C-alpha cells in the first residue's frame, strides 16, 4: 500500500552521508538509492528521503523486518 507520495529518485551527497547518523543508535547509515532510504542496519530501520531531504525521525522510519516493532 502506498501513502500517495510519488517516489522520485534522488542521490545523497557522500559528504552528507558521512555526517548523518541513526538517531536511535547513533550508528552509520547506508544509502539505498533503489528505495530512496537511509538504512540503519543496527536499528533495523529505513529512513525515507523526500525531495532530497533525509527524514531522520524514528516515527517516520520503516522497520526493515515488517513484524519487528520500531525501537
Swiss-Prot record:
Q: Which Pfam families match?
A: Trm112p
Entry GO CC: cytosol
Q: Which family does it belong to?
A: Belongs to the UPF0434 family.
The protein, known as: UPF0434 protein Meso_3270
Q: Which species does the entry assign this protein to?
A: Chelativorans sp. (strain BNC1)
